[in-house]
Amino acid sequence: MYKNPYGLEIYLIKGDITEIEADAIVNAANSYLQHGGGVAYAIVRKGGYIIQKESDEYVKKFGPVPVGEVAVTSAGKLKAKYVIHAVGPRYGIEGEDKLESAIFKSLLKADELSLSSIAMPAISTGIYGYPFEICARIMANVLKGYKPKTLRKVMICLYTKDAYDVFKSIFNSILKN
């Protein structure tokens, strides 16, 4: 467990994000909120079609979610109240600032919804191709400087041992007091 200067508790967890109990689960989404692969597909498969249905309604009403921004739906059958769909950048196409924004806006949205805990995957490291090292560095720096309102606990959920090991090493160097 790590703690940022503002008391935010940060946990690294190796496992399946769809099994985590949290007020919100962050989904690594695309702009059209079409949850067809990776963590997005796993979230809809476990949480139920309602998540995709609400996502479709969101895009119909508000248009595609810009890269670096977030949208919110219910969490269906997941052990959460909400899914925060964060649209991360594609490696080599959109910049690191968009990844920083997607992470920051996810935390901000959790506070806007008065949540105390969220689970977050390694955004943009799947089909969008971001190296774990870059994602971990950006995430650790955003978390280090984030001043929460109601948010108390952030669980970074990593699916593979490789991802977990990289995040642990980088989080140790950036977040260890």
Curated annotation (Swiss-Prot):
Which Pfam families does the UniProt record give? Macro
Q: What is the superkingdom listed in this entry's lineage?
A: Archaea
Q: Please list the residue ranges annotated as the Macro domain.
A: 1-175
Q: Which SMART domains match?
A: A1pp (SM00506)
Gene3D superfamilies associated with the record: Leucine Aminopeptidase, subunit E, domain 1 (3.40.220.10)
Q: What is this protein called?
A: Uncharacterized protein SSO2899
Q: Which organism is it from?
A: Saccharolobus solfataricus (strain ATCC 35092 / DSM 1617 / JCM 11322 / P2) (Sulfolobus solfataricus)
